[in-house]
């Protein structure tokens, strides 16, 4: 397979075709089984976080280092010239991109990564832009699903919780729609999946259902994707009302399919109780670990032609 990801901006999961997603998953699997600590030797990658992050930033920087690359950047954009001196994002990107071979950005404003790609002289990878897209999270989700199910095809997938602002569920739904999966959206009315995602599913002829409880679909699921209500996107009164809308307990897992796996982009608050952690269905910590391999795969394919023949 030709590596069409080489030197490409990765802003939205919709920037990637089905074959490209399959190539990334295959590359992640190869790098997990056979580490390659020299692939990014002499490559410099900028890691620029204008919004708080733990797992995304650390797994991305770990991915660069384990491939032999070097990192420049910052974990808090508030302490940069953009944050302190009023420099524009466009100017910051033009300067920083002149120092590196790839530019990884997280920002709290929707569209910031796309804007960065217009001014960057090197490929831009979106690490999350507001409530819009989070494509690298989607890649580790796809890898985790493939790893546990042996396929991405024709799966029964439920998304639960904050589907309105949860950028991870937007991106993953778009990706899995390329693999003929059936979707079940479980959310309170205030947090329903955005209309544009539903419209895309309709256009593609994908099956989906809407629910306010998990009970009626639990026994049919292959993947249960839980999300937290994102406190940073609500005022305190609304957050307190919504935060406990859906809580998964171990008792709710009676009668589920043997192959069911529970995923969560983390951090969790109280939407998955700790008694679920010890069940054979919990996979969210392994999922987080897979972030390193998925981001290694993406970096390798964007910056080299090493795995184009997988």
Swiss-Prot record:
Pathway: Pyrimidine metabolism; UMP biosynthesis via de novo pathway; (S)-dihydroorotate from bicarbonate: step 2/3. The keyword Transferase applies. It holds the Pfam family OTCace_N. Carbamoyl phosphate binds at residues 55-56, 106, 134, 137, 266-267. Its EC number is 2.1.3.2. It comes from Shewanella halifaxensis (strain HAW-EB4). One of its GO terms (biological process) is 'de novo' pyrimidine nucleobase biosynthetic process. It comes from the Bacteria. This is Aspartate carbamoyltransferase catalytic subunit 2. Keywords: Pyrimidine biosynthesis, Transferase. The keyword Transferase applies. L-aspartate binds at residues 85, 167, 228. InterPro entries: Asp/Orn_carbamoyltranf_P-bd, Asp/Orn_carbamoylTrfase, Asp/Orn_carbamoylTrfase_sf, Asp_carbamoyltransf, Asp_carbamoyltransf_Asp/Orn-bd. One of its GO terms (molecular function) is amino acid binding. It is an enzyme of class 2 (transferase). Belongs to the aspartate/ornithine carbamoyltransferase superfamily. ATCase family. Catalyzes the condensation of carbamoyl phosphate and aspartate to form carbamoyl aspartate and inorganic phosphate, the committed step in the de novo pyrimidine nucleotide biosynthesis pathway. Heterododecamer (2C3:3R2) of six catalytic PyrB chains organized as two trimers (C3), and six regulatory PyrI chains organized as three dimers (R2). It catalyses: carbamoyl phosphate + L-aspartate = N-carbamoyl-L-aspartate + phosphate + H(+). GO terms for cellular component: cytosol.
